[in-house]
Design a protein with these regions (language model features):
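Phosphate/pyrophosphate- and phosphate-bearing ligand-binding catalytic cores of soluble enzymes
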Residues: 3-10, 143-306, 321-337
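A generic alpha-helix structural signal
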Residues: 29-34, 90, 191, 208-211, ...
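Anion-binding (especially nucleotide phosphate/pyrophosphate-binding) glycine-rich loop
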Residues: 1-144
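Beta-rich strand-turn-strand
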Residues: 95, 304-310
Length: 337
């Protein structure tokens, strides 16, 4: 039976996998990485497949799908193997009375992917709470313990792991706090859902519940029966600009260390692409989510090529309207737009 990336990713597109390895422990993962380091076979390492689109030609080398499951709580530190389901990490930390991850509830994927993307939601980003990580260096074959500040977290969704495939995350350690209150809630949608003022706090478990409700309402919690969740979540990155074009003067804006961050969903909808757009475009297999304009979705039967053509169509429309070029937030392998 040929395994394809349509079987392994939440977008459910992509061609065949050459050779698939699924290590179920950290030691098996390190062994598999050592083996691949001595081979000329191209290597692709993936976690939950929730932020990955692979082209229709697939990947003809080796794919390591990380399945390691070790999880340890020691005081205010939570250490997770790269393959642990991310939402399980959030749940366990809250069950242990630890606050800090609640705003990241419901995000699909594995723990090892969080520093790669510097995953964030509702005002919390991985780099806020990550203390250290165990990394495999594919060049030297060494395991290295890194402090979080070595990850090269810069602007939105960036890290050294996005810029090079030399290092593979094997384990992550978060420093949380024992608290009955969340950090200040700065997002109006979340504050409204919690019934508090912006800038107020709430019980971490209540924040988790509110975040899950908001994510479900936007089609951002995986459900195989719901085509709005056949996606990578946010497909486009929110652009960060030194200067906002006059045409985008009315766009909401947020502070970022590198400039002004604009919500890509606002730009997309104001460029003539409402939620659900695309069912009448092309062959109808790809559309924006009916609940969130930032999410490109597979309506059933789409190919990676269909997804790329549709993404280019949205990107070009936004650029024509506002002079701002959107790029992908997800990882694209053997495909582009």
């Amino acid at each position: 039976v040929t395994i394809t990336f349509a079987d392994l990713t939440t977008m459910r597109v992509g061609g065949p996998v050459g050779r698939l390895l699924v290590p179920e422990s950290m030691s098996q993962l390190v062994d598999a990485l050592h083996e691949s380091a001595g081979s000329d076979d191209p290597l692709l390492v993936m976690g939950g497949g929730s932020n990955l689109v692979v082209g229709d030609i697939g990947w003809h080398g080796t794919v390591i799908k990380v399945g390691s499951s070790e999880l340890d709580v020691d005081g205010e530190r939570v250490t997770a193997a790269a393959g642990v389901d991310w939402d399980h990490v959030v749940r366990v930390s809250l069950d242990q009375g630890l606050a800090g991850l609640e705003a990241l509830s419901g995000i699909p994927g594995a723990a090892g992917g969080t520093p790669v993307q510097n995953v964030g939601a509702f005002g919390t980003v991985t780099s806020d709470v990550l203390e250290s990580l165990l990394v495999f260096d594919r060049t030297t074959g060494d395991l290295e313990r890194w402090p979080a500040d070595r990850c090269g977290f810069g602007s939105h969704r960036q890290s050294v792991f996005k810029r090079s495939d030399r290092w593979v995350v094997v384990e992550v350690t978060f420093r949380l706090r024992r608290s009955e209150q969340s950090r200040a809630i700065e997002y109006a949608d979340l504050a409204n859902r919690l019934g508090i003022e912006v800038g107020g706090t709430a019980a971490p478990a209540d924040v988790r519940q509110a975040v899950l409700e908001l994510r479900r309402s936007r089609g951002m919690v995986l459900d195989p029966r719901d085509h709005d969740t056949w996606s990578v979540g946010s497909f486009f990155v929110n652009p960060v600009l030194a200067d906002v074009p006059e045409r985008a003067a009315e766009c909401p804006r947020y502070f970022d260390v590198k400039g002004t961050k604009l919500p890509a969903a606002w730009l997309i909808e104001r460029s003539g692409f409402p939620r659900g757009y695309g069912r009448e475009w092309g062959n109808g297999t790809v559309s924006l989510s009916t609940r969130h304009a930032l999410s490109v979705t597979n309506r059933g039967g789409a190919t990676a090529s269909d997804v790329m053509k549709f993404a280019a169509h949205i990107r070009d429309g936004v650029e024509a309207r506002f002079g701002i070029r959107l790029g992908p937030e997800c990882d694209l392998v053997n495909c582009s737009f």
